[in-house]
Amino acid sequence: MSSFVESAKRVLIGRPIRSKAAARQLLPKRLALPIYASDALSSVAYAPDEILLTLALAGSLALIKSVWVGVVVACVLAVVVLSYRQTVHAYPSGGGDYEVVTTNLGPSWGLLVASALLVDYVLTVAVSISSGANYLTTIFPGLRGSEVPIAVGLIIFLTLVNLRGTREAGTAFAIPTYAYMIAIAVMIIVGFVRLFMGNLPMADSAAYDIHAASSHLDGLTGLGGVFLLMRAFSSGCAALTGVEAISNGVPNFKRPKSRNAGITLLMLGGIAASMMISILVLARYTGLQMVDDTSMVYLHGSAQPDVHFAPVISQLASTIFGDGSLLFIFVTAVTGFILILAANTAFNGFPTLASVLSRDSFLPRQLYKRGDRLSYSNGIMALAVGASALVILFDASVTRLIQLYVVGVFVSFTLSQLGMIRHWNKRLRLPQNGSERSKVLRSRSVNIIGFMMTGFVLAVVLVTKFTHGAWITVLLIALVFTIQRLIRRHYDTIRGQLRVEDWHTRRALPSRVRALVLVSNLSKPSMRAIATARAQAPINLEIVSVVSDLEEEKHIRSEWKESGLPVPLTLVASPFRDITQVVISYVRSRRQRSPEEMLVVYIPQFLVQHWWENILHNQMALRLSRSLLRIPGVVLTIVPWKLGEDIQVDGRQSVNDPFKRQ
């Protein structure tokens, strides 16, 4: 069985990679961009939609503000990118926001940021994969109703790809990510060329008239209009998700790590901002519209409740290239695919952050080490399990999942900005020349502006989305935070109990050692255990057997006499046939009789040749060992006997057994 599992593992994941080959797994910028930017770039596929959907609540005229909302979002993106460029240079170890906040604001605030990021990474996978699954069912209507199994299957696929290693994942995802960027770039260029030539057609949705919702009849005027603009702005800020992943993945970059990570950040920010603003500008000039509540839609004065609005990119591709054209199909297909690949950013960020938290004793140790392929395999699988659970619980509904999104990342953004402000304040207290001080002041100004912007977005998101599902995210962050505190407390307690404070006392040997061998009969495994115990020369040795009736007692006594062993036999009665409790009681009584002495218990255990044979045996040795391990002052020794190892070879006795005389 084990060989079959190992073979399957090698087929799916690949052969192990030596630790010294880690340098060859590091990412150049051309691979780092698709790995870490797919999340942020894919947000261009739905951030403009969210802006238009929100503004549409105030009617068609309100959509003219969409470009300006996009510009403000791009400004926030620029400030965040500039801030994170400073972070990757100041803290290049891969801790990202967690390290920044822990160092400058304290461990509790750092743990809060880490909890928010972990939750956000899981949500990123759930939202992106669910969106991709729903997009696939739109292209292939026959798959409708199967969104959950499709989404879970896609998560499993991404898990296997990432388990093969970071570099292989980058190679696998580079082509579709670049194809997406090229497709959007071609659409934008052709769109602007047609705009300047005066032959850019209007979108089909431009013919409709969207009436304002009852709560926004005054349009964008008054406090209601300001609040709606803030909602549109906060919805568009989904475009910022994924920016923080690069700061967590600096160790995966080729040298110089910080410089390459900073350049990748600039590339990401520039591409994402230009794509989003260009799409909103083209949407404005084509008259493109989107609305969630179709009861607000009218055509020539008559209601159109059954109208369907395609996503913004699909509408633009249809308008610019023509509905059903090859370029329309290409843009639509790669956009759907990039939504799936967006989850890959989390598959790189989550395991790296989990490894750092594990190093600091906030998460289980299993998340710290790299796997066979030099990826953090346990972290990858933990992320896959968490995301799959959310997909199943929320039925792969993007509408329900999106309400949970963004909160975690903006908690991280805001506290990271505050941490960097504290970082620059510390630098300003050190002696510096004029140019260095001016540079620090400029850097601090960037973070102050970033703190104000991200804090504002966080407040708006919490106010506008709390009752719609953001409360679940807040609860999850609090739960993860509490669990990590409990894990740290456990590890601190264990460290305190294991720490040697008096070396003289711990060097001392036990005064005397007593031993007993637990047997059910005097078989070959039992005789080996007895021989092992005798070889250790304890001051006292006895054979202990539990008997439940007179027949068993006669049988073991007969074997003992026939063996001629110079070791006393002790029979313990068990009229109720409960072997485990009887053995535990007997061992405890021996310990109480001689508490200053060490008691060694030997248990023979035979090992079967095939995994399925274990089902046929009662595994008494394992049950006894688990119980005896918890008795203070008792040392347990398992003496194994592999079935078939004493078979004669070429008519001669095997010489591999040290217990057999030659």
Give the ranges of each region predicted by the language model.
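C-terminal membrane-solvent junction of multi-pass transporters and transport-like membrane proteins
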Residues: 366-377, 413-466, 504-506
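TM-loop-TM module centered on a large, flexible mid-protein loop between adjacent transmembrane helices
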Residues: 106, 267-270, 274-341, 367-392
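Loop-to-transmembrane helix boundary motifs in multi-pass membrane proteins
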Residues: 28, 107-110, 145-152, 252-274, ...
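Extracellular loop-to-transmembrane helix junctions
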Residues: 52-103, 107-114, 127-154, 271, ...
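Membrane-interface "cap" regions at the ends of multi-pass membrane proteins
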Residues: 1-53, 62, 82, 93, ...
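Helix-loop-helix junctions that connect adjacent transmembrane segments
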Residues: 178, 185-241, 299, 464, ...
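Hydrophobic alpha-helical segments and their helix-loop junctions in multi-pass secondary transporters
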Residues: 181-213, 280-288, 414-431, 486-495
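Cytosolic C-terminal regulatory domains/tails of membrane transporters and channels
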Residues: 1-21, 492-662
